[in-house]
Swiss-Prot record:
Residues 86-87 form a propeptide. Its main location: secreted. This is Toxin Cll5b. Has the structural arrangement of an alpha-helix connected to antiparallel beta-sheets by disulfide bonds (CS-alpha/beta). One of its GO terms (cellular component) is extracellular region. The keyword Transcription does not apply.
């Protein structure tokens, strides 16, 4: 029983360490999600934790939302073959 708990704890830790991070990106425009309040930012945190993003924490860094703990399926900036187009 103790071995099973130890293995589970190790796997959870590995998943946390290897989690993806990066700037949130708008898939239709290819642009980063912008923000103005640097550091702890309620809007960035909310966007990162949204069900379609799946992140664990978000904050404003260099005037864009940076997310930590993202699944590999969530795209981050820059998108391959798509540059930011502000239309």
């Amino acid at each position: 029983m103790n071995s099973l708990l130890m293995i589970t704890a190790c796997l959870a830790e590995i998943g946390t360490v290897w989690a993806k991070e990066g700037y949130l990106v708008n898939k239709s425009t290819g642009c980063k999600y912008g923000c103005f309040w640097l550091g702890k930012n309620e809007n960035c945190d909310k966007e990162c934790k949204a069900k379609n993003q799946g992140g664990s924490y978000g904050y404003c860094y260099s005037f864009a939302c940076w997310c930590e703990g993202l699944p590999d399926s969530t795209p981050t900036y820059p998108l391959p073959n798509k540059s930011c187009s502000k239309k």
